Curated annotation (Swiss-Prot):
Listed Low complexity bias regions: 115-141
GO cellular component terms, A-Z: cytoplasm; small ribosomal subunit
Tagged with keyword Ribonucleoprotein: yes
Organism: Parvibaculum lavamentivorans (strain DS-1 / DSM 13023 / NCIMB 13966)
Highest taxon in the source lineage: Bacteria
Stretches for region Disordered: 84-141
Annotated protein name in UniProt: Small ribosomal subunit protein bS16
UniProt GO molecular function: structural constituent of ribosome
InterPro entries: Ribosomal_bS16, Ribosomal_bS16_CS, Ribosomal_bS16_dom_sf
Gene (name only): rpsP
Gene Ontology terms describing biological process: translation
Length: 141
């Protein structure tokens, strides 16, 4: 029997409230569970102590028995210092696609050319501009 530590949704429509439960992976999300070990109320502010409550001793017990936490519960347990999450890395997924890479390369080349032109213009000896002549006085009528 594969066990998960997961969230079971309760509460009213648009007012979620979750129980942190130990359940068989084959049972429905909000269905039968083995034990309730905590609660999570996402409507409370993040700094509120009542937002997430977990019985740490029971969580340690179920983790030692082999229950696997879901991503969200793993985050809660990691914050409590009970469980360490594995680092997630998928650099290929976040990489820009082919057309976006072409656009980025073109923008980079244009920027380099502009920088080179500005540098060349700055290094060229500056020719003295002729002094502006004083404006002629207007004829008096």
């Amino acid at each position: 029997m594969a066990l998960k530590i997961r969230l079971a949704r309760g509460g009213a429509k648009k007012r979620p409230f979750y129980r942190v439960v130990i359940a068989d992976t084959r049972s429905p999300r909000d269905g039968r569970f083995i034990e309730k070990i905590g609660t999570f109320n996402p409507l409370l502010p993040k700094d509120n102590a009542e937002r997430i409550k977990v019985d740490i001793e029971r969580a340690k017990h179920w983790l030692s028995v082999g229950a696997l936490p879901t991503d969200r519960v793993a985050r809660f347990l990691d914050d409590a210092g009970v469980y360490t999450r594995k680092a997630r890395s998928n650099p290929e997924k976040s990489k820009p696609k082919a057309k976006a890479q072409e656009r980025l390369e073109a923008a980079r080349m244009a920027e380099e050319e502009a920088a080179a032109a500005a540098k060349a213009a700055a290094e060229a000896p500056a020719e003295e501009a002729p002094a502006a002549e004083a404006p002629a006085e207007e004829a008096q009528a």
